[in-house]
Amino acid sequence: IHGKLAEMAGNYGVFGEAKRGKNLADLQKDLENGFVCIASVTPYFRFGQQKPDGSFYGKGGHLVPVYGCETEGGKAAYFLLHHPSMYAEYNVPHWAVTAEEFAPSFSGNYIRFRKAGTLRQAAAADALVMSRIYAESWKVAFRGNVPDGFLDGLSENHWVTFFEKTLTEGSLSAKLIFDKERAVGAVAYGAARTELPAGGTLVGKGGDYSAFGEVASLYLLPEYYDKGYGRELLESVRDELLGTYEGVYLWVLRENMRARAFYEKLGFVPTEDACLCDIDGKTLTDIRYVYHK
């Protein structure tokens, strides 16, 4: 079944997150959050399952991509888009059905996906957009670790000068990811930098990372956490850097367990290297994570 799901995901331009749901309430919640879900329905599902000769398609359950949408009257509905192979063979169109209509044929199992966000290279003109994303993310991601006074005083243009300079001179590259027309995440990356984050001090074995690429920073608007956008950003720059460098590294705050789990899930491993830096009189520790080819 995973092979079939992968095939369908490719056809619809989405990627899977390997999250399984077990009931209609979970499915509805994921649809409301913008995911595409591939659900298993019974062979007697009455919307689009009947062949021209009157018989039903398939001998067992059928996998159906499910999108969230609304009817003209504003009532929540499921938008069903069948596998492309069915178009040619059975001339099956699309249907929008209500939860009540969908529920009797829903097997109770689905896997959620998300439409791929739009990525583009960032330029110096995007400095304010990037800075705004970073500032909003910092205020949520680092609350409780970075001093409140620093976070509360963080303005949306805090990083504008930095990004204007680095993106103009080419010392860093950057990418933005969009949800429709809205920039919701950004990543800065490039060759390994000689300086440490925030002018910090290295503790640990160190080592020669001059042949590595570096993900200098990656942040999302808080409402876009855990929706696949960060993964798409990271995988894009990681793969780009691996085309030139022996590996990729990044620094992550020791106490930021959400971020650490995210990087570990995508193949980065922690090292014994730490960077000690000071923000408003508080010493913070970043851990170096490395991804090898």
Predicted features along the sequence, with ranges:
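Short, high-confidence coil segments that cap the C-terminus of an alpha-helix
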Residues: G34-F35, L172, Y245
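Noncatalytic regulatory segments and standalone regulatory/sensor domains
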Residues: Y57-G58, Y67-G117
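Short, solvent-exposed loop/turn segments that connect beta-strands within catalytic domains
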Residues: T71-A77, K180-R182, D280-K282
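Acetyl-CoA-dependent GNAT
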Residues: Q121-A127, S131-G144, G149-E223, L234-S236, ...
